[in-house]
Swiss-Prot record:
Organism: Shewanella baltica (strain OS223)
Gene Ontology biological process terms in this record: L-arginine biosynthetic process
Catalyzed reactions: N-acetyl-L-glutamate 5-semialdehyde + phosphate + NADP(+) = N-acetyl-L-glutamyl 5-phosphate + NADPH + H(+)
Gene3D superfamilies membership: Dihydrodipicolinate Reductase, domain 2, NAD(P)-binding Rossmann-like Domain
EC number, as in UniProt: 1.2.1.38
Gene behind the chain: argC
Protein name: N-acetyl-gamma-glutamyl-phosphate reductase
């Protein structure tokens, strides 16, 4: 039985992960924590999320005493916190010997030079960063099992990389073009005008400048053109990706490449049949559908995930179970 502390439990991702871990026979929840300045401290989780009324846990402030209690009692800590907050908390808990599963972007790049540009801070813990493993569960299981510092991928990179990594050896130098739409929960729980019911509308954002683009590039090993879109639905991501494959590539070659997922129970691959967001919402699954034109050499692959599940909480749970061999 492994004991897990969840920091940032009042947000969509933290609450979703709480529900997932609560349902696991081999895991227990050491505690749920929020910032000492949070208006939610002291509240039962079910006050914020009535659908979790079966989870009788309260949101505690992350005081120094709480940190000491986590170190004494927990086997791992999950950080569902802002990037700049995770930066320091992850390094501290790692130094105390706990396994750290960070859902922010603070440890996703191995190159410290990336952080000022994409996250607005200098990375102060290069020695911890050097130990961090990118937690793309279907691809990095051995590394996840071997380290105590796991950077859980972003939602868009999870959808995109799950679709693209099998094709890496077949790609030409032409940039893959990724157009992805996410539900409004991807913007977080904090009230914002552009995500309010009366204002939200399908629109691109972060064009040629979204921080998930270099994350995808780093893990794929090739430049991409990535355009995210805000959708007028609650949860889910659909990424439609167009790539050019090397001359002589056949449909059979593509099918063989995607056979890498034959033993991956959470990834479904279909030829000439494309996924729908509704089919993956509230599941830990990724559905892929692809079609290849041998004459032009262009392939279109669509990837559907739940941004709060496979794109965040359920992938963190995958990483926890891989790390602890559960």
């Amino acid at each position: 039985m492994k004991n897990i502390a969840i920091i940032g439990a009042s947000g969509y991702t933290g609450a979703q992960l709480t529900a997932l871990i609560h349902a696991e026979a081999d895991l227990t929840i050491q505690g749920l924590y929020v910032s000492e300045n949070s208006l939610d401290k002291g509240k039962p989780l079910a006050d914020l999320y009535p659908s979790y009324s079966h989870i009788a846990l309260t949101l505690s402030p992350l005081s120094d005493d709480a940190k000491a209690k986590i170190v004494a009692e927990a086997d791992a800590v999950v950080l569902a916190t802002e990037h700049s907050v995770s930066l320091h908390l992850a390094a501290w808990f790692y130094s105390q010997g706990l396994a750290v599963f960070d859902l922010s972007g603070a440890y996703r790049f191995s190159d410290v030079a990336q952080y000022p540009k994409w996250y607005g801070f200098e990375h102060e813990y290069p020695e911890v960063l050097a130990k961090a493993v990118y937690g793309l569960a279907e691809w990095n299981a051995k590394e996840i099992a071997a380290t105590k510092m796991i950077a859980v991928p972003g939602c868009y990179p999870t959808a995109s990389l799950t679709a693209l990594k099998p094709l890496a050896s077949l790609l030409t130098s032409a940039y893959p073009v990724i157009n992805a739409v996410s539900g409004v929960t991807g913007a977080g729980r904090k009230a914002q005008l552009h995500t309010s019911f009366c204002e939200v509308s399908l629109t691109p954002y972060g064009v040629l400048g979204h921080r998930h683009q270099p994350e995808i590039v780093t893990q794929l090993g090739q430049e991409v053109i990535f355009t995210p879109h805000l959708g007028n639905f609650k949860r889910g991501i659909l990424a439609t990706i167009t790539v050019q494959l090397k001359p002589g590539t056949t449909t059979a070659d593509v099918a063989a490449a995607y056979s890498v997922y034959d033993q991956a129970p959470l990834v479904t691959v279909k030829h000439n049949q494309f996924p729908k967001v509704d089919d993956v919402v509230l599941t830990p699954n990724c559905h892929l559908g692809w079609k290849f034109d041998e004459n032009s050499g262009y392939l279109v692959v669509a990837s559907a995930i739940d941004n709060l599940m496979k794109g965040a909480a359920s992938q963190a749970l995958q990483c926890i179970k891989i790390h602890f061999n559960l």
